[in-house]
Design a protein with these regions (language model features):
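Solenoid-like repeat scaffolds
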Residues: 43-47, 80-86, 114-121, 146-154, ...
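Long, non-transmembrane cytosolic or organellar matrix-exposed soluble domains/tails
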Residues: 171-251
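Helical anchoring/docking segments at protein termini
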Residues: 1-52, 223-251
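N-terminal topogenic membrane-targeting module
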Residues: 24-31, 35-108, 112-115
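N-terminal alpha-helical segment
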Residues: 53-56, 72, 125, 141, ...
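Alpha-helical linker/edge segments of TPR/alpha-solenoid repeat scaffolds
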Residues: 51, 68-70, 98-109, 135-144, ...
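Alpha-helical adaptor scaffolds
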Residues: 83-164
Length: 251
């Protein structure tokens, strides 16, 4: 991560310079200015990277809205070169690339990207789990879903997807256990409760209430009405993290 290294180097140079030139006679006292310089340098570098990656994400979104999938993918891959400058950037971009490959039913390629992707938001791990589900990798699916529900424990859809896949594998009891865990984290959740009752009665898990959020994963062959797009929670870096955007001046 070049941002951290450059920032620390700048801070160290300031501290050493102040100490060796005699501007500050105490080594301990020379540390504080170096720390401040390192912090300022890191903030400025992060802002610079965020300012460069924001347009990349927005360009990818425009390509997707225009149905230009390959161009959207190229835009996101082009942003990977900035990953060395921000600790979270590469994982975020790979999550988005993986989601697009999943949409194209390239589950092998999607899994490769998603394994290197950030674990947050929970959708990143859920996409990976769905890849494993389609590849009939039961252990990989369970591991990825466990990560998904750990991150998104308050998201009833995460628990529902996990249970749906287990039930589809003929593991009804395991699916009920997952839904029960989901209810422990979300007491009184009517969607999870309804799915438990449906399974106990030998019916299908209820997924219709989730609409496009469920259809986005295409597990039951459903198609999102909004077409192909990166889930909002997975986009990231469309705006500078931690900083407000300057308002556009009206002419």
């Amino acid at each position: 991560m070049w941002t951290l290294l450059v920032s620390l180097a700048a801070g160290a140079l300031v501290s050493v310079g102040l100490r060796t030139t005699g501007a500050i006679h105490s080594t301990g006292a020379a540390v504080l200015p170096g720390v401040l310089v390192a912090a300022v340098a890191m903030v400025l570098l992060f802002r610079r990277v965020a300012g460069r990656i924001g347009p990349v994400i927005e360009e990818a979104q425009r390509h997707l809205q225009g149905g230009r999938r390959e161009l959207a993918m190229a835009s996101l891959r082009g942003g990977l070169e900035l990953g060395r400058w921000h600790p979270l950037l590469e994982g975020s971009l790979r999550a988005q690339i993986g989601a697009l490959l999943y949409d194209q039913q390239d589950y092998d390629g999607a899994a490769v990207e998603l394994r290197r992707a950030a674990k947050r938001p929970w959708e990143s791990r859920a996409f990976l789990a769905c890849c494993y589900f389609r590849q009939r990798d039961d252990d990989g699916m369970a591991k990825a879903f466990e990560q998904a529900v750990k991150v998104g424990e308050k998201e009833d859809l995460a628990w529902t997807m996990y249970a749906w896949c287990l039930n589809a594998q003929g593991k009804k009891d395991a699916a009920l256990q997952v839904l029960a865990r989901g209810l422990e984290k979300n007491p009184g959740n009517q969607r999870l409760r309804g799915s438990v009752e449906a399974l106990k009665e030998g019916k299908k898990i209820k997924v219709a209430p989730y609409g496009d959020r469920w259809a986005r994963f295409g597990l039951d062959g459903s198609i999102a009405t909004g077409g192909m797009k990166i889930p909002k929670a997975m986009r990231g870096f469309a705006q500078r993290p931690g900083f407000r955007q300057r308002p556009t001046k009206k002419r």
